[in-house]
Amino acid sequence: MKFTREERLKSSKIITTLFKGANSFSCYPLRLVWQEVNRAELPLSIQSNSPILFALSVPKKTFKRAVDRNVLRRRIRESYRLNKEKLYNLLKNNELYAEKQFAFMVLYTGKEEFSFVEIDKGIKKMIYKFEKELQATIRK
């Protein structure tokens, strides 16, 4: 699956609400901040068919050189792209979440640069944890 433009979280409004009162958990070296967004309430300019709006951040304070930050961003983005299909299937097959959209912000929390394999393990663990949290809310 491709990582398309309509999957990217670009709305500063949604990003600020994410950091004010969203759910979050860590899977070292990553931290996921997520929030459920009602698709109907979004302005037309932000609406997309994608069930997940995705953004990521690598801290400038930890990685001074832009080259290092860009390498980590590429690794995270590629790992997410390779693993998102399982997550999309879960959301599209569940009637409760057919009209919902989720905003994801992935923060890199590691102090050193990790390889793609280690980042991929973190993304897989993160997706697994998110699925468990969703299933827990479905049962309620």
Functional labels for PLM-detected ranges:
Residues 1-140:
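Positively charged, solvent-exposed patches that mediate nucleic-acid binding
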